[in-house]
């Protein structure tokens, strides 16, 4: 028996819960929100899909009662205000930091053994805050961003190469931000063959550029943050944990010397399993990639400094 709680019944949280229910990732999924009736209504709607989608996951909707989330194996935190058009992730930090601290207090109280996946933005900084505020071991606090960014990268690579998307592999490291992420073309492949064999340099550069503005593009089109892919990426990470898949996933991890960085949560490839982050994978970076990663870390630290300025940590 396994139990997962999703904090925040907005579009991302509800999508994550729905994907987990349909895939029967956990025995029980709890969706909690501060808005009266929102979680209950969405979980009732989801439950009424069960005969159509042939799943038997226990679904529980809760309004601000963390007792019902007790003993969760994994907690996915999506709660926070969404990014609006022309709003940077960094501008979200003041409000979302306060929300995160309140959530973490309740998660640690009722599910002290849980692995926490942070989805709310600015993701790397809020992952860092979750680690510091919770006092939990670093392997149990994971930021989702790299998984989403890598999925977007693979989609654009598939378009650039004309390859079947299921045969494309690609990875994005660095911060989860428009200017801080680093799509690694040098590591991207189609059926194990470098993508440079399938697409021109110009097309690959376009794939990188489109990936880096992927979130902003969607925000401009729909007027708010995306939800389908972020929700699915979160659900995929939960599945990797509960099924002990030992899956390599680019995600925000706390570094202690890896990649030349310390005391920071930032996107790197990691093996994800039942213990959370089971291993940070060291990949060789070119001089240019290493310089970009260092610059990305500097940018994330600049955002982290706001936490100290507002006395969040």
Provide a role label for each language-model segment.
Residues 88-154:
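Rossmann-like NAD(P)(H) cofactor-binding subdomain of soluble oxidoreductases
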Residues 1-4:
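Extreme N-terminal starter segment of soluble prokaryotic enzymes
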Residues 9-10:
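Glycine-rich Rossmann-fold phosphate-binding loop(s) that bind the pyrophosphate
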Residues 13-14:
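N-terminal Rossmann-fold NAD(P) dinucleotide-binding loop
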Residues 51-114:
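Rossmann-like NAD(P)-binding element
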Residues 134-140, 149-313:
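C-terminal substrate-binding/catalytic lobe of Rossmann-fold NAD(P)-dependent dehydrogenases
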Residues 34-72, 301-309:
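Conserved N-terminal Rossmann-fold NAD(P) cofactor-binding segment
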């Amino acid at each position: 028996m396994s139990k997962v709680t999703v904090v925040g019944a907005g579009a991302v949280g509800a999508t994550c819960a729905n994907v987990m229910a349909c895939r029967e990732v956990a025995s029980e999924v709890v969706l909690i929100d501060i808005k009266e009736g929102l979680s209950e209504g969405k979980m009732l709607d989801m439950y009424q899909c069960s005969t159509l989608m042939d799943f038997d996951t226990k679904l529980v909707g809760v309004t601000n009662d963390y007792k019902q989330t007790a003993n969760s194996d994994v907690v996915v935190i999506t709660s926070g205000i969404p990014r609006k058009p022309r709003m940077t992730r960094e501008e979200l930090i003041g409000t979302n930091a306060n929300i995160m601290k309140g959530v973490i207090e309740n998660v640690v109280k009722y599910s002290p053994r849980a692995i926490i996946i942070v989805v709310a933005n600015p993701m790397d900084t809020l992952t860092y805050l979750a680690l510091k505020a919770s006092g939990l071991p670093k392997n149990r606090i994971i930021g989702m961003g790299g998984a989403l960014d890598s999925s977007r990268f693979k989609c654009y690579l598939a378009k650039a190469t004309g390859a079947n998307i299921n045969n494309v592999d690609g990875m994005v490291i660095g911060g989860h931000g428009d200017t801080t992420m680093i799509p690694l073309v040098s590591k991207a492949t189609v059926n194990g063959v470098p993508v440079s064999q399938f697409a021109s340099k110009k097309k690959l550069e376009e794939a990188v550029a489109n990936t880096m503005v992927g979130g902003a593009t969607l925000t401009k089109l729909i007027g708010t943050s995306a939800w389908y892919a972020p929700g699915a990426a979160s659900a995929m990470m939960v599945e990797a944990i509960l099924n002990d898949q030992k899956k390599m996933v680019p995600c925000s991890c706390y570094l202690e010397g890896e990649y030349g960085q310390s005391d920071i949560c930032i996107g790197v490839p990691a093996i994800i399993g039942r213990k959370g982050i089971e291993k940070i994978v060291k990949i060789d970076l070119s001089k240019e990639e290493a310089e970009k990663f260092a610059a990305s870390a500097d940018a994330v630290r600049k955002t982290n400094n706001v936490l100290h300025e507002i006395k969040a940590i």
